[in-house]
Amino acid sequence: MNLEKILAQYDAMFGTTSLEEIEDYLVNTITEAKEKSEYGIVITLLNEIIGFCRDTTQKEKALRYCEELQKILKLMKLEGRIDYATSLLNVANAYRAFGLFEESLGLYHIVEETYKKQVAPNDFMYASLYNNWSLLYQEMEDYV
């Protein structure tokens, strides 16, 4: 499976096909990647479908995919790696979007600790983390 082609096809679908067809494409491609044990592709596509479900306000599906993604990350022993932190940041953002503030906060802390061990202090990854973290505090109405 070619991830670049999969993502190009996915991107090309927006504006030309229905949201249902786009979701079906992601689900079917995730299933195929699992069948072929292409877990790097599975992780990428689970991140994509979490964002898709977040943007289309499909809470139950998003949370199910968040759980599945976290299980795969642990199964593959990716804890402490940057790609693990990136996926957790995506999950934390989904949790925040659906009002699971404490769960989101816990994941932001894990992402920060991972970044402290893996990236330079001035790395742009921190900007994304802290921007999303600040949105969490705003939504929690915690301004202190």
Positions of predicted regions on the chain:
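Amphipathic alpha-helical segments of tetratricopeptide repeats
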Residues: 27-31, 70-75, 109-117
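Structural signature of tandem alpha-helical TPR/SEL1-like repeats
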Residues: 103-106, 110, 142-144
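Conserved alpha-helical positions within TPR/SEL1-like repeat arrays
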Residues: 8-15, 44-55, 82-97, 124-139
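Alpha-helical segment of the N-proximal tetratricopeptide repeat
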Residues: 4-24, 28-35, 51-59, 97
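Short coil/turn linkers that connect adjacent helices within long alpha-helical scaffolds
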Residues: 35-38, 75-79, 117-121
